[in-house]
Amino acid sequence: AENRGMVTLLFWGSVFMALVLVYALGNWLPKLMVEAGYDLSTSLVFLLALNIGGMLGAICGGYLADRFNLAKVLCSLFLSGAIALILLSYNLPMVILYFCIAVAGAASIGGQILLLAYMSQFYSSNIRATGLGMALGVGRLGAILGPILCGWLLSLSLPINYNFIALSIPCVIAVMSVSMIHLRLKKTKLAVKALQI
């Protein structure tokens, strides 16, 4: 029970961070890219790239998760997202820029969808709906705070690279949370095996 409680808190943190990122980018990406020197019409196309990346992240991530470890796929997604967001602060060729935005979309939107799959595996059927519902409820706070924090960041008129570095922080925290979940669950499985022996 103690292990389940700690893992639940870590899941809440992961979903919270994922939704901070989903809604911060979904609401403010065009403005961030305008601040980075791109015109508005191009910046709106970036939003399309973000959502296409999210769709591909969910599909490809799901495919990989069925063949490999889901936690490792999630950590790879969120880590890639953090790197992609930091790279956005540099003057990149347009193709690489679109790719980085798509990766950020895969990490935020795709990562959040895969987190639900991970939670579904963790909770037994009699408490699954409660576990997922509570995690998504906590995550909603992230969905509210994400756009507010991003708007506040932009109002500070900081150098644009600071904004993208700040946006990469939720990805890094999500990597740490998912890693801790994976390690705790692995330790529990080993302890159960030891008792069975």
Regions found by a protein language model. Name each.
Residues 72-86:
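Structural signature of the two symmetry-related core transmembrane helices
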Residues 40-41, 125-135:
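Loop-to-transmembrane helix entry/capping segments in MFS-fold secondary transporters
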Residues 168-197:
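Multi-pass alpha-helical transporter architecture, strongest
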Residues 2-59:
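Extracytoplasmic gate region of multi-pass secondary transporters
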Residues 89-100:
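Helix-loop junctions at membrane interfaces in 12-TM secondary transporters
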Residues 154-169:
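A membrane-interface helix-boundary motif in multi-pass transporters
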Residues 110-123:
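Intracellular juxtamembrane helix-capping segments at the cytosolic ends
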Residues 33-34, 64-65, 150-158:
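Interfacial helix-cap and linker-helix signal at transmembrane-aqueous boundaries
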